[in-house]
């Protein structure tokens, strides 16, 4: 007699799906003891099982269905666990739900939004009377320890939605909230959320899937969007896949897991945390260097370390080249969009994952949700790198997406161009030349990442270098900012690039100081440039800190968010005089920005810093310019003067053109980049004056209401910021 445990099905992922998706394919991952050899059938109308994929582990079975004709309802899956008449059978009811809205109706975040980034564990605790949640692994909640959990949750965020609307932000991005059931390790924990152990479940310490949906619904009612942080590059060590690999190629470089471990060791130079399980010589650590993915001269070892190396030993590296892994991840992102109603995704460690797999994900999301948005974290401070990752980039290297020319027969003659789709002259003409970037782009040249938004680490880097400098005639201070935008021609869409001063992985912009003048200059820039702005929680009350000792020093608890806090910075009464001053100033700018078409739709103009002063303008076209534009052979986008104007559709004389009003059509940002008084030389900027107007031009300062005549010189105080509108 066999002592083997009976076959079972203990889990199906995803637990439900949605009828009417543009891609009719559904992958179901069945998990259970001995499930690999099971047979699965269904007679549900409009559904057909295309294939069963039996992986190396006996405890997984992948079922691929085609749902092209299926309507919402309960689909019956008949599972036979062994062959023969006496084989154990089961019927599983699988819900196919009706979509709440069409994919085209899901609107993502744009440059008209301002994202507020926070860490749920450190922002606010809503469930204050509940006992600690029991998890499989050991953990502690201790607010005195910067690297342990502090107890914040989704309910705490929900309870403070009015705070965000008062401040004036329009979207919330918080670090991952999915289950991270990993043990504390040498005084550190996964409170940050980047070590997923269940891709379909909110971590119980943060709340439930239902609470996530409630938070999202109420945020939408208040005009706030929700951006979900996801990680395709890696999972957590305690994910069930790691202890029972579906297949050996489910992870990159998994060999070290089966070999004896050495004593615990530091995971990377300069990193204080250690991995309790130890590592061995087979362990492949990522180099954290992203440039090999675009480097035309990159060595194979450098590319492998970047893409296949593990971020840390406790975060196994997923293999996106495995089509089953990629299908699982793509479906997971779609499931959260449909189930929770999120408005965007921030993809962590984007270039560390396989570029071709990520492009296939982005292409499918673009097709399913054409107005949705995804931002990929791409931590390289050179614009050419991040621009190469953006959708429709002209500089994306083909080899980055795995594009290769076909081999010529015996090297006797060159292979035809990859995009002519002709037979390749291989031996006996037995093969055809594969299309470059097959399954990535409709046309193989140029390759396309399909990623709408990238992160502007170049702006972050230049701004943080410039903040303590005096602006000289050439390179330092505001010259760094000016030169950053010189390279915007590399981006297909600069207005869809996300800019920021700091985040949870960097020093706070203020460092250990409290320089309000420096912060106001940076914020004024951030909120007016051709970008999608992102703020880090607490900036509005001048929270500071550096990572010199620990990451937790830049991830401090928001005052008033937790039981026992002495004060609450959520209220005017709980903030200090200095904090209220910054909060009021920033709130005015944020609320003004929501109404400023000049900032979000206008043309950006910048002037080289002159005698320490940096000037940037945003202009909407006037009615006269719109009329001229309408008669031109080519027409710049002018959404406020028509929709937009097309050649030959001149604006009638005297007509009122929506949005082309005199007041508010122009925004002028003036920054004194020195610690001394400086002069605004009006004559230098007269091209910004409305046509035919040489007399007084009165501009209103947005935060103070003070009036300035921009046709006259005036003096700027040290590090002064003027945000003018006229």
Regions found by a protein language model. Give the residues of each.
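Beta-strand/beta-sandwich contexts
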Residues: 5-36, 96-99
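Immunoglobulin-like IPT/TIG beta-sandwich domains and homologous Ig-like subdomains
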Residues: 21-85
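Edge beta-strands of extracellular beta-sandwich domains
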Residues: 88-97
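Low-complexity, Pro/Ser/Thr- and charge-rich linker/hinge segments at domain boundaries
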Residues: 96-117, 122, 126
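Substrate-binding/active-site clefts of carbohydrate-active enzymes
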Residues: 124-334, 339, 358-369, 373, ...
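Active-site-proximal helices and loops of the catalytic beta/alpha 8
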Residues: 234, 332-334, 338-492, 497, ...
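Carbohydrate-binding surface patches
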Residues: 591, 607-624, 649, 657-688
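C-terminal beta-strand-rich structural cap/linker in extracellular carbohydrate-active enzymes
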Residues: 708-726
């Amino acid at each position: 007699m066999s002592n083997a445990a009976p076959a079972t099905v203990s889990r199906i992922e995803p637990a439900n799906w949605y009828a009417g998706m543009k891609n009719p394919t559904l992958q179901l991952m069945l998990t259970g003891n001995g499930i690999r050899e099971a047979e699965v059938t269904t007679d549900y109308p409009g559904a057909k099982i295309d294939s069963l994929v039996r992986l190396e582990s006996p405890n997984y079975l992948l079922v691929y269905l085609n749902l092209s004709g299926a309507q919402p309802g309960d689909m019956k899956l008949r599972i036979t666990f062994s062959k023969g008449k006496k084989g154990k059978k089961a019927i599983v009811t699988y819900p196919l739900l009706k979509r709440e809205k069409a994919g085209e109706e899901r609107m993502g975040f744009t440059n008209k939004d301002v994202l507020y980034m926070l860490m749920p564990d450190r922002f606010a605790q809503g469930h204050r009377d509940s006992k600690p949640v029991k998890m499989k692994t050991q953990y502690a909640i201790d607010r005195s320890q910067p690297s342990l959990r502090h107890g914040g949750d989704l309910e705490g965020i929900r309870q403070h939605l009015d705070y965000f609307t008062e401040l004036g932000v329009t979207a919330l991005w918080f670090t991952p909230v999915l289950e991270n059931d990993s043990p504390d390790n040498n005084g550190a924990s996964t409170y940050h959320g980047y070590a997923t152990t269940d891709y379909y479940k909110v971590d119980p310490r943060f709340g439930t899937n239902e609470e996530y949906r409630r938070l999202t619904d109420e945020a939408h009612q208040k005009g706030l969007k929700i951006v979900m942080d996801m990680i395709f590059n890696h999972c957590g060590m305690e994910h069930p896949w790691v202890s029972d690999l579906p297949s050996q190629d489910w992870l990159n470089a998994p060999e070290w897991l089966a070999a004896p471990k050495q004593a615990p060791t530091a995971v990377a130079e300069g990193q204080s945390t250690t991995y309790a399980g130890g590592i061995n010589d087979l362990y492949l650590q990522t180099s954290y260097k992203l440039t090999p993915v675009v480097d035309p001269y990159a060595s194979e070892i450098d590319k492998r370390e970047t893409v296949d190396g593990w971020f840390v030993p406790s975060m196994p590296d997923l293999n996106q080249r495995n089509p089953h892994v990629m299908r699982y991840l793509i479906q997971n992102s779609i499931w959260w969009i449909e189930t929770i109603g999120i408005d965007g995704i921030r993809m962590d460690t984007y270039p560390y994952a396989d570029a071709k797999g990520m492009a296939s994900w982005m292409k499918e999301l673009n097709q399913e949700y054409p107005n949705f948005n995804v931002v990929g974290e791409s931590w390289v401070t050179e614009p050419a790198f991040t621009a190469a990752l953006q959708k429709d980039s002209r500089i994306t290297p083909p080899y980055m997406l795995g594009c290769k020319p076909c081999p010529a027969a015996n090297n006797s003659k060159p292979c035809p161009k990859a995009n002519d789709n002709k037979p390749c002259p291989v031996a006996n003409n037995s093969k055809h030349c594969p299309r470059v970037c097959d399954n990535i782009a409709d046309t193989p040249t140029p390759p396309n990442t399909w990623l709408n938004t990238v992160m502007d680490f170049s702006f972050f880097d230049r701004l943080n270098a410039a903040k303590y400098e005096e602006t000289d005639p050439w390179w330092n201070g505001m010259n760094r900012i000016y030169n950053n935008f010189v390279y915007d021609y590399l981006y297909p869409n600069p207005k869809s690039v996300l800019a920021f001063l700091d985040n949870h992985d960097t020093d706070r912009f203020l460092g250990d100081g409290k320089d309000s003048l420096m912060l106001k200059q940076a914020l004024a820039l951030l909120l007016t440039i051709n970008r999608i702005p992102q703020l880090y929680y607490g900036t509005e009350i001048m929270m500071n800190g550096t990572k010199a000792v620990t990451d937790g020093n830049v991830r401090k608890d928001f005052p008033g968010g937790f039981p026992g806090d002495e004060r609450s910075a959520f209220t005017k009464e709980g903030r200090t005089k200095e904090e209220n001053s910054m909060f009021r100033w920033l709130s005015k700018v944020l609320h003004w920005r929501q109404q400023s078409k000049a900032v979000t739709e206008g043309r950006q103009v910048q002037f080289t810093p002159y005698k320490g002063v940096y000037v940037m303008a945003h202009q909407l076209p006037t009615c006269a310019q719109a009329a001229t534009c309408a008669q031109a052979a080519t027409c710049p986008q002018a959404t406020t003067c028509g929709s937009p104007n097309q050649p030959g559709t001149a604006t009638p004389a005297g007509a009122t053109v929506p949005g082309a009003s005199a007041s508010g059509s122009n925004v002028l940002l003036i920054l004194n980049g020195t610690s001394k008084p400086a002069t605004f030389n009006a004559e230098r900027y007269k091209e910004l004056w409305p046509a035919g107007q040489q007399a007084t031009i009165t501009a209103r300062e947005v935060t103070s209401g003070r009036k300035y005549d921009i046709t006259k010189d005036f003096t700027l105080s040290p590090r002064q910021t003027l945000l003018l509108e006229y």
